[in-house]
Every structure is written in C-alpha cells, then in structure tokens.
Amino acid sequence: MRIAILSRNENLYSTMRLKQAGEARGHEVDVIDTLHCYMDITSNNPKIRYKGEELPQYDAIIPRIGASVTFYGTAVVRQFEMMGTFVVNESVAISRSRDKLRSLQLLSRKGIGLPRTGFAHHPDNIQDVIRNVGGAPLVIKLLEGTQGIGVVLAETNKAAESVIEAFMGLKANIMVQEFIEEAKGADIRCFVVGNKVIAAMKRQAKEGEFRSNLHRGGSAQLVRLSKEERATAINAAKVMGLNLCGVDILQSKNGPVVMEVNSSPGLEGIEQATNKDVAGMIYEFIEKNAKPNSNRTKGRG
C-alpha cells in the first residue's frame, strides 16, 4: 500500500516509528508536512499539492496533527476525505476531540464516567463556580492547554478564586474540575485502535506533582485493565468517532473517569512501558480497513 503520514516533524519518535513499521511490512510510506500542503478547493476533481507537485493517490493517511495546527491540519485531512482516501482518524473526529468542552459534553451525554466539571469564561460569581463542583481541592484548566500546560491544582477555595481571577484576566475559557485525590497522582493511558485497547500504561506523577504527563517528568509502567476501565476507554473512543486515540482515565472511588481523549497519542511512552509494537498494530488496522471511499463522513463536513 502507499501510505502518507501527516506530520510536521519527520524526526519525532512517533513519526519515525510509523514510517519504519510501515516499510517493514512492505508499504511505501511518505512523511508529508501538513502545513506545506495546499489545496485546490473549487475543482470538481479535488487535489492536494505539495512542493510544486500534485500528491499521488494514497491508500491511507495517518494524521499526526498537533494541537497548534488543528484548523489547517483538519482542512488537509478533509481534503483527503473528499478525494476518497481512507484516513485513520477523520477530520470531524479530530476537531471534536480537540475541543475539550465539546468532548466532555458528548461523553456526558453517552453516560461515560467523568469528574464533576464546570466551564466558565467570565463568571459573575466565582464562589458559586467553585461550590458547583464541590469546592477545593480542585483542578483549574485553560481549555487550550496540552501536555499539562495551563493546569493548576488549587488546594483551597481562596487559591481557586485567585487562579480563576488570573485566568479571567487572560480572557480565557476555563474548566474547573473536582480533584480526584484517590488517584494519587496517577492516571491510565489506554491506547485504542479500531475499538480495541491494544496497550495500556499507568503514568505516575513525579514527587510533589499532580500532573502525570510524561512530558512533565512522570514515569510509566505496564498496567492490567479492569473490564470497566477497558469498556470505558473503548466507549469514549466510539463517542469521539476516533479509530486511533489515547484515552486518559483516572481511578476514582466511583469507578473510572475519563480526563481526555487524545486523537494524536505519542508512541514512545506506550511502546517503552508495554514493550508492544504499537506502530505495527496500527498498520494491521489499516491493512484490514483501508478501502477507497470508506470514510464515514466522506469529507462532507
């Protein structure tokens, strides 16, 4: 098969592993810088051009769209959909998952376990926002943050007020969530491909830190999932419409709760923690499912 990886950096671990794994299975794999693609929108024969030439017809596209380029990246993915190319994650599903509020609203509607969450931009009564999620300790997040950036743990109501006021000064949309203390600074990353959890790791925050992101110095190890945790991860992926994603779960006293669904999960941490060929399993999914015009949305919106 001829497959393209949409990635701005061919030297990232995930991009290199996907190229290596695909070529090892006999596929022709190109890495294409998403931002350097340009499109012929009005033509009856939709095209994508790159470095002065029309891109060939690919059998499948693996989008690795960074959060900072979601708007243009999903436009490129949508153009591939209009051309009838199979995409591992469709543009509408990527957009859905990148909007943290929209994600939580959709998950909530389907009865997926979530931490108690509030959303605000410029509330008239900050104390009521805090009371509404059960009071401190609580976690306050900037809606646009990634890799644990823009996430603050407020241990008292007064501290929470101060943080919310500071974020309001930035004219930012903020999310206020109950702090799942019983998780003890750990979460579970479930790697879902094709409605199956193919790998899972437990990430533990470093001493004195509550964010378990590996980018923030957390550690990771193999974990055995309960049936409920596995079902939660699979259902969350289905709600988002993602064929490939990382579902981050906390173990609360009320059962597993979903913190985030990541449409472009990194491969390095999960492969090292589990010793599994995650990249190879992504290609197994592509080989079984990549057919022309088989996307559910077909680029319609």
From Swiss-Prot:
Q: Any one Gene Ontology biological process term?
A: translation
Q: Which residues bind Mn(2+) 2?
A: 260, 262
**Where does the ATP-grasp domain lie?**
104-287
Cofactor note text: Binds 2 magnesium or manganese ions per subunit.
Could you list this entry's UniProt keywords, alphabetically sorted: ATP-binding, Ligase, Magnesium, Manganese, Metal-binding, Nucleotide-binding, Protein biosynthesis
Q: Which SUPFAM superfamilies match?
A: Glutathione synthetase ATP-binding domain-like (SSF56059)
A single MF term (Gene Ontology): ATP binding
Give the cofactors, semicolon-separated: Mg(2+); Mn(2+)
Where along the chain is Mg(2+) 2 bound? Answer: 260, 262
Quote the record's binding site residues for ATP: 141, 178-179, 187, 211-213
GO cellular component terms given for this protein: cytoplasm
Q: Can the keyword Nucleotidyltransferase be found in this entry's annotation?
A: no
Task: Give binding positions for Mg(2+) 1.
Answer: 248, 260
User: What EC number(s) is this enzyme filed under?
Assistant: 6.3.2.-
Top EC class per UniProt?
Answer: ligase
From which domain of life does this come? Answer: Bacteria
Which PANTHER family would you find in this protein's record?
RIBOSOMAL PROTEIN BS6--L-GLUTAMATE LIGASE, RIBOSOMAL PROTEIN S6 MODIFICATION PROTEIN
As for family, the record states: Belongs to the RimK family.
Concerning HAMAP family, the annotation shows:
RimK (MF_01552)
Protein name according to UniProt:
Probable alpha-L-glutamate ligase
Species this protein is from: Vibrio vulnificus (strain YJ016)
